[in-house]
Amino acid sequence: MVTIIPLIKIKMENNHLKYQVVKEQYLKFLSSQEVMSEPFRDKLGQLKNFYLPISRMIKEEYTKEKKTKLIGLSGGQGTGKSTISKILKIILKENYGLETVIFSIDDFYKTLQERKMMSKNKSALFLTRGVPGTHDTKRLYNCIKKLKDQKFKKFKIPKFDKSIDDRLPKNKWLKVKKKPNIIIFEGWCIGVPPQKKKDLIKPINKLEKQKDTKKIWRLQVNKELKKKYKKIFNLIDKLIFLKVPSFKYVFKWRLLQEKKLRITGKGKKIMSNIEISNFIMYYERLTKHMLKILPRKADTVISIDKKHRLKSIKFN
């Protein structure tokens, strides 16, 4: 006698097996990222309520045309962009068989020498990496186009070492040998539009008041957003925004990042509290602008609560 197993039952069993694999890989990854003083909370709840729905949205976007899709992941410093990107990569691979490449806008910072030249020709503030204008936008645009190209050829993505404040040599760049289905492009200013001119008049903090008295720096940053960065952001198929409660938590969570680096011993150059406070002033204007604009502009908004936990998700 032949036993016929309904297709729906087979599908349910396969889905259950996939979930078990995803759960195992997910928990294993989180375990590797934890430090004793800051354990991850509600791990399975976060998987079910956030990571699985987001990965499903990405998969559905890919299924529309079966072409490489660029997913922008935007959020202030310390919001967890790198961790979220890696978790999504695990789920997309194990659940849907999709190959994912992750890279950060940080890896496309101009070299130290290039920023020194820019600081002489434009504003001394451009020596400090971070704001639009301090990235190699031509290289970044070409990289995304190559990854999305149907006639894909293997190539390398730059790597930037923040401990030396410079780009690494080519032999240490990320090798992409296979055409990806999904590209996760993460960074603190991904998808941010330029500001209105009237919003640039008043300095937003001590840095701008004392070191950008003629508005040269912030006007140039805005100019970069209007042209070069807009061209790059237009390539994004879906934009995910990590919304923080307020800018003060960017400082708080950046302190947490430095604390973790001290504990794990991964940081070669750890910043003091005063150094962090001064450093994030460079990011303040655009971070506050993003908090006003991106909750309406992004395709998906993930709100993060004051305790650094994923609080809610909204698909626009």
Model-derived segments and spans:
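Phosphate-binding/switch loop-helix module in NTP-utilizing enzymes
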Residues: 146-186, 191
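Pre-Walker A adenine-sensing motif
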Residues: 53-64
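Walker A (P-loop) phosphate-binding loop of P-loop NTPases
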Residues: 78
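Conserved NTP phosphate-binding and transfer environment spanning the P-loop NTPase/kinase superfamily
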Residues: 8-25, 41, 48-51, 188-316
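Conserved nucleotide-sensing/catalytic segment adjacent to the nucleotide-binding pocket
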Residues: 101, 110-160
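Conserved lysine of the Walker
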Residues: 81
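Hydrophobic positions on the alpha1 helix immediately C-terminal to the Walker A/P-loop
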Residues: 84
